[in-house]
Protein backbone atom coordinates (compact mmCIF):
# COMPACT_ATOMS: atom_id res chain seq x y z
CA UNK A 1 0.00 0.00 0.00
CA UNK A 2 1.30 3.42 -0.91
CA UNK A 3 1.76 6.09 1.73
CA UNK A 4 0.78 9.73 1.84
CA UNK A 5 4.33 10.59 0.83
CA UNK A 6 3.68 9.41 -2.73
CA UNK A 7 3.42 12.17 -5.33
CA UNK A 8 0.21 13.23 -7.00
CA UNK A 9 1.46 11.77 -10.30
CA UNK A 10 2.13 8.42 -8.63
CA UNK A 11 -1.35 8.38 -7.11
CA UNK A 12 -3.00 9.33 -10.40
CA UNK A 13 -1.14 6.53 -12.19
CA UNK A 14 -2.03 3.95 -9.56
CA UNK A 15 -5.69 4.95 -9.57
CA UNK A 16 -5.83 4.93 -13.37
CA UNK A 17 -4.60 1.33 -13.29
CA UNK A 18 -7.24 0.46 -10.69
CA UNK A 19 -9.84 1.91 -13.03
CA UNK A 20 -8.55 -0.03 -16.03
CA UNK A 21 -8.62 -3.29 -14.08
CA UNK A 22 -12.15 -2.63 -12.85
CA UNK A 23 -13.42 -1.84 -16.34
CA UNK A 24 -11.79 -5.00 -17.70
CA UNK A 25 -13.37 -7.09 -14.93
CA UNK A 26 -16.81 -5.55 -15.45
CA UNK A 27 -17.29 -7.16 -18.86
CA UNK A 28 -17.08 -10.84 -17.83
CA UNK A 29 -18.86 -10.08 -14.56
CA UNK A 30 -21.81 -8.57 -16.41
CA UNK A 31 -22.51 -11.91 -18.10
CA UNK A 32 -21.67 -14.14 -15.12
CA UNK A 33 -24.41 -16.61 -14.29
CA UNK A 34 -26.49 -16.36 -11.15
CA UNK A 35 -24.93 -19.62 -9.97
CA UNK A 36 -21.42 -18.23 -10.41
CA UNK A 37 -22.17 -15.05 -8.49
CA UNK A 38 -23.89 -16.93 -5.67
CA UNK A 39 -21.01 -19.40 -5.48
CA UNK A 40 -18.59 -16.48 -5.15
CA UNK A 41 -20.66 -14.90 -2.38
CA UNK A 42 -21.03 -18.10 -0.38
CA UNK A 43 -17.32 -18.85 -0.76
CA UNK A 44 -16.54 -15.30 0.41
CA UNK A 45 -18.74 -15.78 3.49
CA UNK A 46 -16.95 -19.04 4.27
CA UNK A 47 -13.57 -17.39 3.75
CA UNK A 48 -14.62 -14.59 6.11
CA UNK A 49 -15.20 -17.09 8.91
CA UNK A 50 -12.03 -19.04 8.12
CA UNK A 51 -10.01 -15.81 8.28
CA UNK A 52 -11.70 -14.66 11.49
CA UNK A 53 -8.40 -14.67 13.39
CA UNK A 54 -6.59 -12.63 10.75
CA UNK A 55 -9.46 -10.14 10.54
CA UNK A 56 -9.52 -9.66 14.31
CA UNK A 57 -5.75 -9.17 14.42
CA UNK A 58 -6.01 -6.56 11.67
CA UNK A 59 -8.84 -4.88 13.55
CA UNK A 60 -6.67 -4.68 16.68
CA UNK A 61 -4.17 -2.59 14.73
CA UNK A 62 -6.89 -0.18 13.65
CA UNK A 63 -8.31 0.02 17.18
CA UNK A 64 -4.86 0.72 18.62
CA UNK A 65 -4.39 3.57 16.15
CA UNK A 66 -7.84 4.93 16.99
CA UNK A 67 -7.03 4.90 20.69
CA UNK A 68 -3.68 6.59 20.06
CA UNK A 69 -5.44 9.27 18.03
CA UNK A 70 -8.03 9.88 20.75
CA UNK A 71 -11.04 8.94 18.64
CA UNK A 72 -14.52 9.16 20.20
CA UNK A 73 -16.17 6.11 21.73
CA UNK A 74 -18.88 6.09 19.04
CA UNK A 75 -16.19 6.03 16.34
CA UNK A 76 -14.38 3.16 18.03
CA UNK A 77 -17.65 1.22 18.31
CA UNK A 78 -18.27 1.51 14.57
CA UNK A 79 -14.70 0.42 13.90
CA UNK A 80 -14.57 -2.53 16.30
CA UNK A 81 -15.05 -6.12 15.19
CA UNK A 82 -15.59 -9.23 17.30
CA UNK A 83 -16.66 -12.82 16.66
CA UNK A 84 -20.32 -11.85 16.62
CA UNK A 85 -19.85 -9.00 14.16
CA UNK A 86 -17.77 -11.12 11.80
CA UNK A 87 -20.43 -13.83 11.88
CA UNK A 88 -23.05 -11.16 11.14
CA UNK A 89 -21.01 -9.93 8.16
CA UNK A 90 -20.79 -13.48 6.80
CA UNK A 91 -24.52 -13.99 7.35
CA UNK A 92 -25.18 -10.74 5.50
CA UNK A 93 -23.19 -11.94 2.49
CA UNK A 94 -25.16 -15.20 2.45
CA UNK A 95 -28.40 -13.21 2.62
CA UNK A 96 -27.32 -11.28 -0.47
CA UNK A 97 -26.56 -14.56 -2.24
CA UNK A 98 -30.12 -15.68 -1.47
CA UNK A 99 -31.67 -12.62 -3.14
CA UNK A 100 -33.13 -12.91 -6.63
CA UNK A 101 -30.64 -11.99 -9.36
CA UNK A 102 -31.81 -8.71 -10.91
CA UNK A 103 -29.61 -9.01 -13.99
CA UNK A 104 -31.54 -10.18 -17.03
CA UNK A 105 -34.94 -9.61 -15.43
CA UNK A 106 -37.54 -8.47 -17.94
CA UNK A 107 -39.05 -5.38 -16.31
CA UNK A 108 -41.64 -4.78 -19.01
CA UNK A 109 -42.52 -6.10 -22.44
CA UNK A 110 -45.02 -5.23 -25.14
CA UNK A 111 -45.87 -5.77 -28.79
CA UNK A 112 -46.14 -3.05 -31.41
CA UNK A 113 -48.75 -3.01 -34.20
CA UNK A 114 -45.95 -3.67 -36.72
CA UNK A 115 -45.09 -6.94 -34.97
CA UNK A 116 -42.00 -5.79 -33.07
CA UNK A 117 -41.70 -7.31 -29.58
CA UNK A 118 -39.96 -4.97 -27.12
CA UNK A 119 -38.48 -5.92 -23.75
CA UNK A 120 -36.94 -3.68 -21.09
CA UNK A 121 -34.27 -5.76 -19.34
CA UNK A 122 -32.14 -5.10 -16.25
CA UNK A 123 -28.39 -4.79 -16.82
CA UNK A 124 -25.44 -4.02 -14.51
CA UNK A 125 -24.36 -0.40 -14.16
CA UNK A 126 -20.73 -1.33 -14.83
CA UNK A 127 -18.16 -0.03 -12.33
CA UNK A 128 -19.20 1.47 -9.01
CA UNK A 129 -16.92 3.50 -6.78
CA UNK A 130 -17.76 3.35 -3.08
CA UNK A 131 -16.17 5.94 -0.79
CA UNK A 132 -16.81 5.39 2.90
CA UNK A 133 -15.51 6.13 6.35
CA UNK A 134 -14.18 3.76 8.97
CA UNK A 135 -16.82 1.03 9.00
CA UNK A 136 -15.19 -2.28 8.04
CA UNK A 137 -18.56 -3.94 7.45
CA UNK A 138 -19.20 -1.60 4.50
CA UNK A 139 -16.29 -3.29 2.70
CA UNK A 140 -18.20 -6.58 2.77
CA UNK A 141 -21.68 -5.14 2.21
CA UNK A 142 -20.70 -2.98 -0.76
CA UNK A 143 -18.53 -5.65 -2.34
CA UNK A 144 -21.24 -8.29 -2.05
CA UNK A 145 -24.10 -6.08 -3.29
CA UNK A 146 -22.15 -4.89 -6.31
CA UNK A 147 -21.13 -8.45 -7.16
CA UNK A 148 -24.71 -9.70 -6.95
CA UNK A 149 -25.80 -6.95 -9.35
CA UNK A 150 -23.01 -7.86 -11.78
CA UNK A 151 -20.93 -4.73 -11.16
CA UNK A 152 -17.23 -4.34 -10.58
CA UNK A 153 -16.51 -2.16 -7.55
CA UNK A 154 -13.67 0.04 -6.34
CA UNK A 155 -13.72 0.39 -2.55
CA UNK A 156 -12.10 3.34 -0.81
CA UNK A 157 -12.55 3.08 2.96
CA UNK A 158 -11.24 5.41 5.63
CA UNK A 159 -7.57 5.08 6.51
CA UNK A 160 -8.59 4.41 10.13
CA UNK A 161 -10.01 1.03 9.08
CA UNK A 162 -7.38 0.20 6.45
CA UNK A 163 -6.10 -2.99 8.09
CA UNK A 164 -9.58 -4.37 8.81
CA UNK A 165 -10.89 -3.55 5.34
CA UNK A 166 -7.85 -5.15 3.67
CA UNK A 167 -8.38 -8.38 5.62
CA UNK A 168 -12.08 -8.48 4.71
CA UNK A 169 -11.22 -7.71 1.09
CA UNK A 170 -8.97 -10.77 0.94
CA UNK A 171 -11.94 -12.97 1.85
CA UNK A 172 -14.04 -11.38 -0.91
CA UNK A 173 -11.29 -12.03 -3.46
CA UNK A 174 -11.06 -15.66 -2.35
CA UNK A 175 -14.76 -15.94 -3.10
CA UNK A 176 -14.33 -14.51 -6.59
CA UNK A 177 -11.46 -16.86 -7.35
CA UNK A 178 -13.40 -19.88 -6.08
CA UNK A 179 -16.16 -19.13 -8.59
CA UNK A 180 -13.80 -18.44 -11.50
CA UNK A 181 -14.62 -14.73 -11.58
CA UNK A 182 -11.98 -12.01 -12.07
CA UNK A 183 -10.28 -11.01 -8.82
CA UNK A 184 -10.25 -7.39 -10.00
CA UNK A 185 -14.05 -7.30 -9.83
CA UNK A 186 -13.70 -6.16 -6.20
CA UNK A 187 -10.71 -3.88 -5.64
CA UNK A 188 -9.68 -1.90 -2.61
CA UNK A 189 -7.81 1.35 -3.23
CA UNK A 190 -4.12 0.79 -2.38
CA UNK A 191 -3.54 4.46 -1.54
CA UNK A 192 -4.09 6.09 1.85
CA UNK A 193 -3.73 9.66 0.60
CA UNK A 194 -7.00 11.56 0.15
CA UNK A 195 -5.87 12.49 -3.34
CA UNK A 196 -7.09 9.02 -4.32
CA UNK A 197 -10.64 10.15 -3.56
CA UNK A 198 -10.17 13.10 -5.88
CA UNK A 199 -9.08 10.78 -8.67
CA UNK A 200 -12.16 8.61 -8.16
CA UNK A 201 -14.42 11.66 -8.26
CA UNK A 202 -12.97 12.52 -11.68
CA UNK A 203 -14.16 9.12 -12.89
CA UNK A 204 -10.76 7.48 -13.55
CA UNK A 205 -10.83 8.31 -17.27
CA UNK A 206 -14.35 7.05 -17.74
CA UNK A 207 -13.87 3.82 -15.80
CA UNK A 208 -16.37 4.65 -13.02
CA UNK A 209 -20.07 4.78 -13.84
CA UNK A 210 -21.42 5.91 -10.46
CA UNK A 211 -20.09 6.93 -7.03
CA UNK A 212 -21.72 5.96 -3.73
CA UNK A 213 -20.47 7.81 -0.62
CA UNK A 214 -21.14 6.34 2.83
CA UNK A 215 -20.24 8.62 5.70
CA UNK A 216 -20.68 11.95 7.39
CA UNK A 217 -21.94 15.21 5.98
CA UNK A 218 -18.52 16.58 5.04
CA UNK A 219 -17.61 13.48 3.01
CA UNK A 220 -20.93 13.38 1.18
CA UNK A 221 -20.85 17.14 0.52
CA UNK A 222 -17.39 16.85 -1.02
CA UNK A 223 -18.46 13.96 -3.23
CA UNK A 224 -21.62 15.74 -4.40
CA UNK A 225 -19.67 18.94 -5.08
CA UNK A 226 -16.67 17.48 -6.90
CA UNK A 227 -17.91 14.31 -8.63
CA UNK A 228 -17.91 14.27 -12.42
CA UNK A 229 -19.97 11.08 -12.50
CA UNK A 230 -23.46 10.37 -11.12
CA UNK A 231 -23.76 10.04 -7.33
CA UNK A 232 -26.19 7.99 -5.23
CA UNK A 233 -26.28 9.66 -1.81
CA UNK A 234 -28.02 11.64 0.86
CA UNK A 235 -26.36 14.62 2.52
CA UNK A 236 -28.06 14.19 5.90
CA UNK A 237 -31.10 12.62 7.50
CA UNK A 238 -33.28 15.35 8.98
CA UNK A 239 -36.22 13.01 9.58
CA UNK A 240 -39.59 14.12 10.96
CA UNK A 241 -42.29 12.38 12.97
CA UNK A 242 -45.74 13.99 12.91
CA UNK A 243 -48.39 13.08 15.51
CA UNK A 244 -51.84 13.91 14.16
CA UNK A 245 -54.85 14.70 16.36
CA UNK A 246 -56.34 11.38 15.19
CA UNK A 247 -53.35 9.36 16.39
CA UNK A 248 -53.67 6.56 18.92
CA UNK A 249 -51.71 7.92 21.89
CA UNK A 250 -50.21 4.60 23.00
CA UNK A 251 -49.01 3.93 19.46
CA UNK A 252 -47.64 7.45 19.13
CA UNK A 253 -45.66 7.14 22.37
CA UNK A 254 -44.05 3.86 21.33
CA UNK A 255 -43.22 5.07 17.84
CA UNK A 256 -41.76 8.37 19.07
CA UNK A 257 -39.38 6.66 21.50
CA UNK A 258 -38.28 4.10 18.93
CA UNK A 259 -37.89 6.64 16.10
CA UNK A 260 -35.59 8.81 18.21
CA UNK A 261 -33.91 6.53 20.73
CA UNK A 262 -33.53 3.02 19.27
CA UNK A 263 -30.31 4.15 17.60
CA UNK A 264 -29.69 7.88 17.69
CA UNK A 265 -26.67 7.88 15.38
CA UNK A 266 -28.26 6.51 12.20
CA UNK A 267 -29.61 8.52 9.30
CA UNK A 268 -33.15 7.22 9.87
CA UNK A 269 -33.40 8.51 13.44
CA UNK A 270 -36.11 11.14 13.95
CA UNK A 271 -34.63 14.59 14.58
CA UNK A 272 -37.84 16.65 14.77
CA UNK A 273 -41.17 15.80 16.41
CA UNK A 274 -44.25 17.67 15.21
CA UNK A 275 -47.48 17.47 17.21
CA UNK A 276 -50.90 18.60 16.04
CA UNK A 277 -51.82 21.67 18.06
CA UNK A 278 -55.39 20.36 18.38
CA UNK A 279 -54.11 17.32 20.30
CA UNK A 280 -51.24 18.94 22.20
CA UNK A 281 -53.05 19.02 25.54
CA UNK A 282 -53.48 15.25 25.43
CA UNK A 283 -50.55 13.98 23.34
CA UNK A 284 -47.56 16.25 23.87
CA UNK A 285 -46.57 15.82 27.52
CA UNK A 286 -46.83 11.98 27.69
CA UNK A 287 -44.67 11.63 24.59
CA UNK A 288 -42.04 14.08 25.84
CA UNK A 289 -42.00 12.44 29.27
CA UNK A 290 -41.33 9.09 27.61
CA UNK A 291 -38.45 10.58 25.62
CA UNK A 292 -37.01 12.34 28.68
CA UNK A 293 -37.17 9.06 30.61
CA UNK A 294 -34.79 7.65 27.99
CA UNK A 295 -32.40 10.59 28.59
CA UNK A 296 -33.39 12.45 25.44
CA UNK A 297 -32.85 16.22 25.47
CA UNK A 298 -35.97 18.11 24.38
CA UNK A 299 -35.64 21.39 22.48
CA UNK A 300 -39.02 23.00 21.99
CA UNK A 301 -40.71 25.96 20.37
CA UNK A 302 -42.27 28.59 22.65
CA UNK A 303 -45.69 26.92 22.64
CA UNK A 304 -44.07 23.57 23.51
CA UNK A 305 -42.25 25.17 26.46
CA UNK A 306 -45.56 26.55 27.71
CA UNK A 307 -46.87 23.00 28.06
CA UNK A 308 -43.58 21.30 28.93
CA UNK A 309 -41.30 23.75 30.80
CA UNK A 310 -38.52 21.15 31.20
CA UNK A 311 -37.64 21.56 27.51
CA UNK A 312 -34.84 23.82 26.32
CA UNK A 313 -35.73 26.63 23.90
CA UNK A 314 -35.27 25.60 20.27
CA UNK A 315 -33.47 27.93 17.88
CA UNK A 316 -34.05 28.35 14.15
CA UNK A 317 -30.93 26.24 13.58
CA UNK A 318 -32.45 23.29 15.44
CA UNK A 319 -35.09 22.72 12.76
CA UNK A 320 -32.39 22.00 10.17
CA UNK A 321 -29.97 20.06 12.38
CA UNK A 322 -29.18 16.35 12.13
CA UNK A 323 -28.24 15.67 15.76
CA UNK A 324 -27.26 11.99 15.51
CA UNK A 325 -27.57 12.10 19.29
CA UNK A 326 -30.18 11.87 22.05
CA UNK A 327 -31.63 15.28 21.18
CA UNK A 328 -34.92 16.10 19.48
CA UNK A 329 -36.50 19.38 18.40
CA UNK A 330 -40.26 19.66 19.00
CA UNK A 331 -42.88 22.00 17.55
CA UNK A 332 -46.65 22.31 17.52
CA UNK A 333 -48.24 22.64 14.08
CA UNK A 334 -51.70 23.44 12.77
CA UNK A 335 -52.77 19.98 11.71
CA UNK A 336 -51.65 18.12 8.63
CA UNK A 337 -51.28 21.36 6.64
CA UNK A 338 -48.87 22.77 9.21
CA UNK A 339 -46.91 19.51 9.32
CA UNK A 340 -46.55 19.40 5.54
CA UNK A 341 -45.44 23.04 5.44
CA UNK A 342 -42.81 22.53 8.17
CA UNK A 343 -41.46 19.29 6.68
CA UNK A 344 -41.21 20.62 3.15
CA UNK A 345 -39.35 23.67 4.47
CA UNK A 346 -36.78 21.90 6.66
CA UNK A 347 -36.57 18.29 5.47
CA UNK A 348 -33.52 16.76 3.81
CA UNK A 349 -35.99 14.55 1.86
CA UNK A 350 -34.80 11.36 3.55
CA UNK A 351 -37.57 9.87 5.73
CA UNK A 352 -40.76 11.22 7.33
CA UNK A 353 -43.45 9.43 9.35
CA UNK A 354 -47.03 10.20 10.37
CA UNK A 355 -49.00 8.64 13.21
CA UNK A 356 -52.69 9.04 12.40
CA UNK A 357 -55.99 7.22 12.04
CA UNK A 358 -57.47 9.84 9.71
CA UNK A 359 -57.18 8.40 6.18
CA UNK A 360 -57.49 11.82 4.57
CA UNK A 361 -54.60 13.19 6.63
CA UNK A 362 -52.44 10.19 5.74
CA UNK A 363 -53.27 10.58 2.05
CA UNK A 364 -52.20 14.24 2.13
CA UNK A 365 -48.99 13.32 3.98
CA UNK A 366 -48.11 10.74 1.32
CA UNK A 367 -49.10 12.93 -1.63
CA UNK A 368 -47.72 16.32 -0.60
CA UNK A 369 -44.38 15.48 1.01
CA UNK A 370 -41.53 14.86 -1.41
CA UNK A 371 -39.16 12.67 0.59
CA UNK A 372 -37.62 9.35 -0.45
CA UNK A 373 -39.35 7.34 2.30
CA UNK A 374 -42.73 8.04 3.89
CA UNK A 375 -44.18 5.89 6.68
CA UNK A 376 -47.62 5.65 8.28
CA UNK A 377 -47.95 4.37 11.85
CA UNK A 378 -44.37 3.07 11.87
CA UNK A 379 -40.99 4.24 13.13
CA UNK A 380 -38.62 6.20 10.91
CA UNK A 381 -35.97 3.64 11.87
CA UNK A 382 -37.45 1.24 9.31
CA UNK A 383 -35.67 3.36 6.67
CA UNK A 384 -33.27 0.55 5.92
CA UNK A 385 -32.70 -1.75 2.97
CA UNK A 386 -32.72 -4.85 5.17
CA UNK A 387 -36.07 -3.86 6.66
CA UNK A 388 -37.39 -3.32 3.13
CA UNK A 389 -36.53 -6.92 2.25
CA UNK A 390 -33.59 -5.90 0.07
CA UNK A 391 -31.14 -8.06 2.05
CA UNK A 392 -28.83 -5.09 2.56
CA UNK A 393 -28.24 -1.63 1.17
CA UNK A 394 -25.23 0.23 -0.11
CA UNK A 395 -26.78 3.48 1.12
CA UNK A 396 -29.90 5.62 0.95
CA UNK A 397 -30.35 8.06 -1.91
CA UNK A 398 -32.48 11.20 -1.73
CA UNK A 399 -31.93 12.37 -5.30
CA UNK A 400 -34.62 11.93 -7.94
CA UNK A 401 -32.57 10.43 -10.75
CA UNK A 402 -32.34 6.63 -11.02
CA UNK A 403 -32.07 5.38 -7.42
CA UNK A 404 -34.13 6.79 -4.53
CA UNK A 405 -34.49 5.43 -1.00
CA UNK A 406 -32.54 2.31 0.04
CA UNK A 407 -30.06 1.35 -2.68
CA UNK A 408 -30.05 -2.44 -2.94
CA UNK A 409 -29.21 -4.85 -5.74
CA UNK A 410 -32.05 -3.74 -8.04
CA UNK A 411 -31.04 -0.08 -7.72
CA UNK A 412 -27.48 -1.05 -8.72
CA UNK A 413 -28.72 -1.95 -12.20
CA UNK A 414 -29.72 -0.03 -15.30
CA UNK A 415 -31.68 -1.40 -18.24
CA UNK A 416 -31.56 -1.87 -21.97
CA UNK A 417 -34.16 -2.62 -24.61
CA UNK A 418 -34.29 -5.84 -26.59
CA UNK A 419 -36.35 -5.51 -29.75
CA UNK A 420 -37.25 -8.64 -31.74
CA UNK A 421 -38.57 -8.48 -35.27
CA UNK A 422 -39.03 -10.68 -38.31
CA UNK A 423 -37.79 -8.43 -41.07
CA UNK A 424 -39.54 -5.11 -40.31
CA UNK A 425 -38.19 -1.95 -41.97
CA UNK A 426 -39.34 1.67 -41.57
CA UNK A 427 -39.30 2.57 -45.23
Curated annotation (Swiss-Prot):
Keywords: Amino-acid biosynthesis, Cytoplasm, NADP, Oxidoreductase, Proline biosynthesis. Catalyzes the NADPH-dependent reduction of L-glutamate 5-phosphate into L-glutamate 5-semialdehyde and phosphate. The product spontaneously undergoes cyclization to form 1-pyrroline-5-carboxylate. Signal peptide: none annotated. One of its GO terms (molecular function) is NADP binding. It is found in: Cytoplasm. Belongs to the gamma-glutamyl phosphate reductase family. NCBIfam families: PRK00197.1, proA. This is Gamma-glutamyl phosphate reductase. The gene is proA. Its main location: cytoplasm. It comes from the Bacteria. HAMAP family: ProA (MF_00412). It catalyses: L-glutamate 5-semialdehyde + phosphate + NADP(+) = L-glutamyl 5-phosphate + NADPH + H(+).
